[in-house]
A protein has these predicted regions:
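Well-ordered alpha-helical scaffold segments within catalytic/enzyme domains
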Residues: 38, 125-147, 164-168, 200-216, ...
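An acidic-aromatic substrate-binding cleft motif
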Residues: 41-119, 123
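Carbohydrate-binding/catalytic loop surfaces
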Residues: 82-111, 175-192, 241-256
Length: 284
């Protein structure tokens, strides 16, 4: 062991006999494993300085979506001590119509009860897809999930798994999108369709279809068609004064227009941009 850096802490805050200080060694960047030692306080935990210090944390954060997969067996080969048998494989009943049941398995659990909802999932998926678009070089095909090694970035494989659940939540006849799957004491309810969920669905599926077309054009087109059907159903039942729905509608129209170039979606973009209130990021 050898001393590689010496310095003195600077007082940040002082209240009575208590002092809060910090040490700044930002100008020291040599890779390695170190600890800090100070009189009275002793040694700190060891820490690393490296250009790749966050790599393992980033990989594990991305893999949390795999651990949260619903409706499939997670083997120990990929899940380790988080392995479990397939869950929530039974039918869910439609809230308000107990005689109607449907398969709502799949996707990602969003809480400890295994519940799932379209808008919450859309927010998560959109952040992941935006990150992938901006920094594609950071996403590999070797993150340790069953799809690893298929020549498709694993983050897109993971999002595709979630889109499979999205497609289950869309009514094949009307294009309506059920809002989610909520647990109760005897099973789970499928929540009724609503415009907000449909616009969120449309935005997410269009964006994924756009990104995925170079890997699987047929599935990408399936997603894009589903987005178009959801949007068209949503505009029939949206509430005129619902601000959040307007934001989702704008985002959905933008993504469908980007992916498919359909001129009919321009009017929704122009309408929103002409409204004067361009607040978006804080609501999405």
């Amino acid at each position: 062991e050898q001393i590689v850096y010496q310095g003195y802490p600077e007082i940040r805050k002082e209240e009575g006999e208590e002092k809060e200080a910090y040490g700044d060694f930002s100008d020291f960047a040599a890779p390695g494993t170190y600890y800090i030692e100070a009189p009275i306080l002793g040694k700190s935990y060891s820490f690393s300085i490296s250009d790749t210090v966050y790599d393992s944390l980033f990989q594990e954060a991305c893999k949390q979506y795999y651990y949260n997969r619903c409706g499939m067996t997670l083997g120990s080969e990929y899940a380790g001590d988080k392995a479990h048998n397939a869950c929530h494989t039974g039918k869910s009943v439609l809230r308000g119509s107990d005689s109607v049941s449907m398969d709502a398995s799949g996707g990602w659990h969003q809480n400890e009860n295994g519940e799932k909802n379209i808008t919450g999932a859309s927010r998560a998926m959109t952040v992941l897809m935006m990150s992938y678009e901006l920094y594609p070089q950071e996403y590999t095909d070797q993150e340790g999930i069953p799809e690893s090694g298929n020549q498709i970035p694993d983050i897109l494989d993971e999002i595709r798994y979630e889109t499979g659940w999205f497609l289950k939540m869309q009514d094949k006849q009307t294009g309506a999108v059920y809002a989610g799957d909520t647990a109760y004491d005897k099973g789970s309810y499928v929540e009724p369709a609503c415009a907000g969920a449909e616009f969120a669905f449309a935005m997410t599926m269009a964006k994924f279809g756009y990104l995925y077309q170079s890997y699987d054009k047929e599935y990408a087109m399936t997603c894009l068609k589903a987005a178009d059907r959801a949007f068209k159903h949503a505009v029939l039942c949206e509430e005129a004064d619902d601000r959040e729905e307007k934001i989702w509608r704008f985002a959905a129209a933008a993504e469908i227009y980007r992916a498919a170039g359909q001129v009919s979606y321009q009017k929704y973009l122009v309408e929103y941009l002409s409204d004067g209130d361009l607040t978006l990021a804080g609501d999405m």
